[in-house]
């Protein structure tokens, strides 16, 4: 029997709960689960959703069967309900009866450390979970969006979720839905009437097609279209596929020092849009300079006037975003050694050891590139950090001058599809590094404390090393899909 690989930790978040006693946690998603760990020791505290034992699973199936027979619908159809019919499922239960998702591609930590916002892929749900003092996770709400979300951000006060979907729309949702039930307005469905008539269509085939269109429009004209059954607001829309959302608040340069907030959004068509918040219909400007799709927008907390963006180009751009002005073009690869197309997977900004640091990960690369951001907004490259596998995500523990890096322990270094011959024991799910004190340039040293050891020893979910080609491709696509944003030769811009 072949040994098992361990599913990598796709997303990482560091949380510190504010209170009389500071509590620190590391939250990670792997496959369809979320794990919480003690940040000091790496001890696993809980997983969500909790596993359902066989007896509960059988009872659930029996209940679904009875419900299905009453509604004259097959039981499997009951598992997929439209958001407008189901509404927000708000529950205090931490055990989910049956997971309808296989991956959690996005995790966002609340600034006070009390909440985690998770995006489950297949069911398109934005889920808010409470992180309790003992590290257990409790789901408070689930809100299924009309289109698949691709990016989540929080406003500065932490009370509003900004959710961008792949069709270019950005919605605002309250972090915690109100106690009063939300009544969704029912909007009349506007029938699409074909512009052609029997007088303008002559062939038999076209006449049959016209008759079919007329029947369809008459049928749908009597139906009503339900809106989302939870509190929400559509803020803005792109005509292109949206890729990332960032939120920033900056003081105005006037006598009153009035603060103003903005939403920055990137898309597949190389655009970065700057919109005012909450009046997002007011477009302050664009940051135009990329020649390929944009995947990541990073606004450092220590320098909110600057934007660092990356995507399908082989360089980063540093912006004075309020002016739409490029300050620097930073190469990511050496031109003479470039053999593959570059895609930026993540950009993280932090302040450690008196240095303003920017970290950059490329899709399918085991190098974590490091830069120092100067006061003039320029990036100075430093020596990269070499990992044992491709970099997936980074969590930053500033108080410890430490970063925790999630690495791909299944695929070969530098590859997004080629699996290793056999798994290692234990699997390297994470690696950690600390800034060396007293060095002139930025240098990192590995950390081999209990945090790393215990998380790696604990593992995640097992995947057979002899998984078939179809299963391998599905797992590859979950982690490495950004390259699909690249336009094919001849595709319209």
UniProtKB/Swiss-Prot annotation:
Q: Which domain of life is it from?
A: Eukaryota
User: What are the protein's UniProt keywords?
Assistant: Nucleus, Repeat, tRNA processing, WD repeat
The Gene Ontology biological process terms listed for this entry are: tRNA (guanine-N7)-methylation
One GO cellular component assignment for this chain's record is: cytosol
User: What SUPFAM superfamilies would the database entry show?
Assistant: WD40 repeat-like
- Name the residue ranges with Polar residues bias: 46-66
- Indicate where this protein is primarily found: nucleus
UniProt-listed InterPro entries: Trm82, WD40/YVTN_repeat-like_dom_sf, WD40_repeat_dom_sf
Pathway involvement of the protein, from the record:
tRNA modification; N(7)-methylguanine-tRNA biosynthesis
Location in the cell reads:
Nucleus
Extent of the WD repeats: 99-139, 237-287, 289-331
The family database entries (Gene3D superfamilies) matched by this protein are listed as:
YVTN repeat-like/Quinoprotein amine dehydrogenase (2.130.10.10)
Stretch list, region Disordered: 46-96
Establish whether keyword Repressor is in the entry: no
So what family is this one in? Belongs to the WD repeat TRM82 family.
Q: How does it assemble?
A: Forms a heterodimer with the catalytic subunit trm8.
Q: Which PANTHER family match?
A: TRNA (GUANINE-N(7)-)-METHYLTRANSFERASE NON-CATALYTIC SUBUNIT WDR4 (PTHR16288:SF0), WD40 REPEAT PROTEIN 4 (PTHR16288)
UniProt function note: Required for the formation of N(7)-methylguanine at position 46 (m7G46) in tRNA. In the complex, it is required to stabilize and induce conformational changes of the catalytic subunit.
**Protein name per its UniProtKB record:** tRNA (guanine-N(7)-)-methyltransferase non-catalytic subunit trm82
Organism, scientific name:
Aspergillus oryzae (strain ATCC 42149 / RIB 40) (Yellow koji mold)
């Amino acid at each position: 029997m072949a040994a098992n690989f361990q599913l990598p930790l796709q997303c990482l978040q560091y949380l510190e709960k504010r209170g009389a006693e500071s509590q620190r946690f590391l939250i990670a998603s792997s496959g369809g689960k979320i794990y919480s760990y003690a940040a000091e020791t790496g001890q696993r505290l809980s997983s969500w959703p909790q596993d359902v034992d066989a007896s509960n699973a059988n009872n659930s199936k029996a209940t679904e069967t009875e419900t299905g027979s009453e509604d004259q619908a097959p039981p499997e159809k009951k598992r997929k309900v439209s958001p407008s019919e189901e509404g927000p499922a708000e529950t205090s239960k931490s055990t989910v009866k049956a997971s309808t998702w296989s991956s959690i591609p996005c995790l966002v930590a609340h600034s006070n450390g009390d909440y985690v916002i998770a995006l489950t892929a297949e069911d398109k749900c934005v889920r808010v979970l409470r992180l309790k003092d003992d590290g257990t996770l409790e789901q408070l709400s689930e809100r299924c969006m009309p289109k698949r979300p691709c990016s989540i951000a929080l406003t500065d006060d932490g009370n509003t979720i900004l959710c961008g979907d792949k069709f270019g729309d950005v919605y605002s949702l309250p972090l915690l839905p109100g106690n009063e039930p939300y009544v969704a307005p029912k909007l009349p469905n506007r029938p699409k009437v074909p512009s052609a008539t029997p007088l303008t269509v002559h062939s038999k085939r076209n006449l049959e097609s016209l008759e079919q269109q007329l029947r369809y429009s008459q049928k749908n004209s009597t139906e009503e279209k339900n809106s989302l059954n939870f509190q929400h607001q559509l803020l803005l829309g792109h005509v292109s596929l949206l890729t990332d959302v960032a939120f920033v608040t900056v003081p105005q340069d006037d006598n009153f020092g009035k603060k103003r907030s903005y939403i920055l959004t990137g898309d597949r068509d190389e655009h970065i849009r700057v919109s005012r918040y909450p009046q997002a219909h007011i477009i302050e400007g664009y940051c135009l300079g990329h020649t390929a799709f944009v995947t990541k927008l990073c606004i450092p907390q220590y320098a909110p006037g600057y934007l660092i963006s990356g995507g399908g180009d082989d360089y980063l751009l540093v912006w004075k975003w309020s002016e739409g002005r490029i300050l620097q073009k930073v190469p990511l690869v050496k031109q003479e050694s470039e053999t593959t197309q570059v895609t930026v997977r993540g950009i993280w900004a932090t302040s450690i050891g008196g240095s303003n640091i920017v970290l950059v990960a490329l899709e399918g690369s085991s190098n974590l590139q490091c830069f120092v951001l100067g006061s003039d907004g320029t990036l100075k490259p430093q020596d990269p950090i070499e990992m044992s596998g491709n970099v997936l995500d980074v969590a930053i523990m500033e108080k410890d001058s430490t970063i925790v890096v999630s690495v791909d322990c299944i695929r070969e270094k530098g590859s997004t599809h080629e699996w290793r011959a056999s798994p290692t024991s234990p699997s390297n799910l994470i690696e950690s590094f600390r800034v060396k004190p007293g060095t002139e340039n930025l240098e990192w040293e590995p950390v081999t404390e209990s945090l790393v050891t215990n998380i790696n020893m604990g593992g995640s979910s097992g995947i057979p090393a002899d998984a078939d080609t179809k299963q391998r491709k599905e797992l590859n696509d979950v982690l490495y899909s950004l390259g699909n944003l690249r336009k094919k030769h001849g595709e319209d811009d």
